[in-house]
Amino acid sequence: MPKSNVEKIKLHILKKLFDQRCWMHKLFNINNIQQGLPPHARDSRIIKKAVDDLIKNKWLLSKPTHYGLELSLNIDKKKEIEEYIEKNLF
C-alpha cells in the first residue's frame, strides 16, 4: 500500500483518470479530483503537490484553461501507470 498522503492521493488521481479512460485528449478538470476523497484528505496543497509530481514524471498531461487546469493520462506511459496502480492497489 502507498505510504504517505501524497502517494495515496497520486494513486487516487491515477485510478480515477484510469477508470474514466482519460487518455490524451479526453480531459478531466482538476477541481473534480477532490470528489471521492474523504474530507480529511481534501487538502488542496497535498493534491497540488501530487499533481505536480505526476506531471513531472510525465504520467499526467496538463492543459491550462480559463476555468482551471485540465488533466489527462499520458498514453506513452500507459504500461507504467497500469503497473503502478496494480502494485499499489492490491
Locate predicted features.
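A short, conserved structural fragment
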Residues: 55-65
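Short acidic, hydrophobic short linear motifs in intrinsically disordered regions
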Residues: 23-37
